[in-house]
């Protein structure tokens, strides 16, 4: 009889970057918040996370990844529920901060080798696509960038190219 091999899931440092610009108003921001809360619920006990929101500027819940302990995850979910959509779309600075933060953290500082991931949640309605793509190409290092397209017509072309540059995948969340 064949025995099932169960490998331990590697610990992850996940930085979620969420678009809260004006183009995300209405259903899009609600979808993005729901997706982010689902992702937070799927973090494992050895994972760490960080959330960066961006519109005209960017801000983060914590400056570095924090352990995915129940208390921190609940605090993050409350933060996400309170996000609103307004303002411009300055994506480059937010992604710069995410990639810098990913590489500032020692991936083995708790004795574990960690997968470093950036998850970009946006409708892709940005003006500086070329700068974004060259930033990802230049700074991704050994991290991976995944894109999640939100809204009725996300910029799938940009999202696919950004995910490819980050050696990740693009997922489109269809409007209900």
Please place each PLM-identified region on the residue numbering.
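Exposed acidic/Ser/Thr-rich ligand/metal-binding surfaces
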Residues: 1-176
